[in-house]
Amino acid sequence: MTVHVQPCAAPAEDPVSRAVRTESGQREVFCGLTGIVWLHRKIQDAFFLVVGSRTCAHLIQSAAGVMIFAEPRFGTAIMEEKDLAGLTDANDELDRIVTQLLTRRPDIKLLFLVGSCPSEVIKLDLSRAALRLSQRFSPGVRILNYSGSGIETTFTQGEDSCLASLVPALPAAQDETSSLLVIGSLADVVEDQFMRMFDALGIGPVQFFPPRKSTALPSVGPNTKILMAQPFLPDTVRALQERGAKRLAAPFPLGVEGTTGWLRAAADAFGIDAATFDRVTEPNRVRAERALGAYKAELGGRRIFFFPDSQLEIPLARFLARELSMQLVEVGTPYLHREHLAEELKLLPAGVALTEGQDVDLQLDRCRLARPDIAVCGLGLANPLEAEGITTKWSIELVFTPIQGYEQAADLAELFARPLVRRAKLVA
């Protein structure tokens, strides 16, 4: 059975030859510290200690929505003015805080020291601190570091930096059996759904990175095949490839078409025949297509504008254009990795306006001129646009919410339909 998608108005273009506008100017994005919000829930025995300012602490606390007395698996070592002025030894204070933390929380098996804008400005070497503390607390606790700074980055790069720092700690694969490594944080329910699908297809062994426990790190080697579940992990992929792993070219598992292409890439790599693939995936495809049908009437023909924010913009645009018949006014993304997104770019309608980077004032001008039905943007732009009568969808919600796979295809469509329904009720 084939996937039913709305045909494009024009054939897709070669991803290499697509015209992309590159912009550089004032940006409107969160920093990489935001990734801690979903990573601390995913790796259940890890702790994320941000070395930063009170602003860093407020950002994570507000975004996570977790009360401090609940003892979440993240915290901030707050740098005071005397630290920034170099009047105290920040390393001594950091050692004291880490010792206090690990004494109080013996359940921590993996500690990330997370750099921020303030710690990078004063050149605090967290890599040396992590090495020093690892020697002290090994083997009970592994201590690593990465940067969550917002200097020239966007918020999803925090996960990439985190996972890349963990790659050297992955054990080497001991046998020559091919294995599949799915990389990128997924909600546990989505991970379980994919695992059942891989089992039914006869694909295995399958491992997920990041794992739910740091004591169950996946192995990697020359026979490891990488399947990207998130498009914002170039450093992690590069680090895994340096360990010998090979990346599978695939679209991302958003919507029916994306999920089918994603699973097919794995099936082809493991020699699964087409008949088996169709038999296993058909019930899920049919159910997902039926569920999407309820949203086509609401979203079909609606015009959408993507501001660059999460790096999910291109897969989302493909899903909305091909499966829900939405019209793409402009698709902006902070960074465009042409190799990793090649399968997605092939599926975008010809002639769609693509933008890499951000000059927020120019993009706001184009959005106001176009007057789309809905704009996907960061929180900082949402309220001003809503005040101007432009319906918005927060891009960060698309990272926090389980949207991958067949079972979540309709949920993903609803995320875009809901703001339009709300706007219609408000003006009625």
UniProtKB/Swiss-Prot annotation:
Pfam families: Oxidored_nitro. The keyword tRNA-binding does not apply. Keywords: 4Fe-4S, ATP-binding, Bacteriochlorophyll biosynthesis, Chlorophyll biosynthesis, Iron, Iron-sulfur, Metal-binding, Nucleotide-binding, Oxidoreductase, Photosynthesis. [4Fe-4S] cluster binds at residues 31, 56, 117. Binds 1 [4Fe-4S] cluster per heterodimer. The cluster is bound at the heterodimer interface by residues from both subunits. It is an enzyme of class 1 (oxidoreductase). One of its GO terms (molecular function) is ATP binding. It comes from the Bacteria. Its cofactor is [4Fe-4S] cluster. The keyword Lyase does not apply. Pathway: Porphyrin-containing compound metabolism; bacteriochlorophyll biosynthesis (light-independent). Its EC number is 1.3.7.7. Component of the dark-operative protochlorophyllide reductase (DPOR) that uses Mg-ATP and reduced ferredoxin to reduce ring D of protochlorophyllide (Pchlide) to form chlorophyllide a (Chlide). This reaction is light-independent. The NB-protein (BchN-BchB) is the catalytic component of the complex. PANTHER family: LIGHT-INDEPENDENT PROTOCHLOROPHYLLIDE REDUCTASE SUBUNIT N (PTHR39429:SF3). Protochlorophyllide reductase is composed of three subunits; BchL, BchN and BchB. Forms a heterotetramer of two BchB and two BchN subunits. This is Light-independent protochlorophyllide reductase subunit N. It comes from Rhodopseudomonas palustris (strain HaA2).
